[in-house]
Amino acid sequence: MPGLLGKKIGMTSVFSAEGKNLPCTVIEVGPCVVTQVKTLEKDGYSALQLGFVDAKEKHTTKPLAGHFKKANVAPKRHLAEFKNFEGEHKLGDVLNVEFFSDADFVDVVGTSKGKGFQGVVKRHGFGGVGQATHGQHNRLRAPGAVGACSYPAKVFKGTRMAGQMGNERVTVQNLEVIKVMPEHNLLLVKGSVPGAKGSILLIEK
């Protein structure tokens, strides 16, 4: 689906017309530059590759430097591909936050905050042991049994255990656009979005 790249600025709250206090996320959206146009005839599908945030040439690999030179645009730090754009677009076109409008509903894709290696209580919401006394020793937050006896004699895939938590791709769907601020390239969406402040997001219609 069509969309743009953006950067999470932080959270705030605004009042609705009914006087309700709405939590919302401020996202800096664009300007995004078209770095590649994919067509049905040449590539088998139609899409736009967009670049976001200027990068220094010394920090750009040679293949990417050639890619940007071919498109006649400055090197970009972040690239993403979006399908099903309407209308004609050519290399070097600039798309900004005016691509969205008030009351739109968008999907936001980002990388969640990494929490490191966590146990089952924090990672999966296990309740822990019920009896905290009467001889119980250091098993308060243990996962308990992970399998049966001699049959099936294995631990099934997908069993909830301790492990790496967060730092994964997360999509939040149907967030309402509260306000578009083109003079500052800002987009206010209702609710929270994944990632820390300054993280890169994909905002899709």
From Swiss-Prot:
GO cellular-component term (any): cytosolic large ribosomal subunit
GO aspect biological process, one term: translation
GO-annotated molecular function: rRNA binding; structural constituent of ribosome
Keyword terms: Ribonucleoprotein, Ribosomal protein, RNA-binding, rRNA-binding
TM segment ranges: none
Gene3D superfamilies: 3.30.160.810, Translation factors
Xref: PANTHER family: 50S RIBOSOMAL PROTEIN L3, LARGE RIBOSOMAL SUBUNIT PROTEIN UL3C
HAMAP family to which the protein is assigned, alphabetical: Ribosomal_uL3_B
Self-association and partners: Part of the 50S ribosomal subunit. Forms a cluster with proteins L14 and L19.
Entry similarity comment: Belongs to the universal ribosomal protein uL3 family.
Job description of the protein: One of the primary rRNA binding proteins, it binds directly near the 3'-end of the 23S rRNA, where it nucleates assembly of the 50S subunit.
Name of the protein this chain belongs to: Large ribosomal subunit protein uL3
Provenance organism: Porphyromonas gingivalis (strain ATCC BAA-308 / W83)
